[in-house]
Amino acid sequence: MTAKKSKSGRMTTALDLTTCEKLEHLQPIPKSRSSSITSIESEDGMMSTVLKPPPRRDFDDLMAFEGFIRDETWDNDFDYCHAHLTYYPPFIMKEVHNNLDKIKPTMNKNSRKFKRNLQHHIKKHLMHDMETCSGFKMDFNKVGMVETPTKVKWRFEDMGDHGFSKEEEDMYGRHWKLELEVTCNNENPLVEVDYKATPIM
């Protein structure tokens, strides 16, 4: 494995899905998270604590996106991260033999074949690989689909226990939800993936 420095300055290891470690047990919330908690006053004068949304990281490469998910688990921030990926799905790259000039104008959300292949890719590859990289169980349920003349957006959510017992989650205060949005458009085969892991307070 080769190590390289990420934009944040930390060392990262090249992604190999066969060597991703499982997250066996939860740990206490990182102390650095306290800087993301703020207090707000409600209309009735009561103070409540609110966690700021996690900062968004943008990617244009599937392996880098998956590597980020793995690194967040290594850094114990798996329940507080936001990643956005814009990419050509592997089934498109295979069909055009990695030559973007060969992309056909019909390769977009208006093509039933494209949507079918994309849904297969999401369920059988993207979600599976994200789970492998995270090291914990992801059980996404489809919670909606919105189609407009220019876009199709699928929304998925996981509010489960991620493979940990309620007692272990309670011991460390680690309850979190996962949200996944996948969007394609009517102009080209570029796909956008938005992944959020946020604590449930």
Swiss-Prot record:
Annotated keywords: Cell membrane, Membrane
Ubl conjugation found in the keyword field: no
Protein location: Cell membrane
Any single GO CC term annotated in Swiss-Prot or TrEMBL for this entry: plasma membrane
GO biological process: energy reserve metabolic process
Membrane association type: Peripheral membrane protein
Protein's UniProt keywords contain Cell division: no
Family: Belongs to the RGI1 family.
Described function: Involved in the control of energetic metabolism and significantly contribute to cell fitness, especially under respiratory growth conditions.
Protein name in UniProt: Respiratory growth induced protein 1
Organism expressing this protein natively: Meyerozyma guilliermondii (strain ATCC 6260 / CBS 566 / DSM 6381 / JCM 1539 / NBRC 10279 / NRRL Y-324)
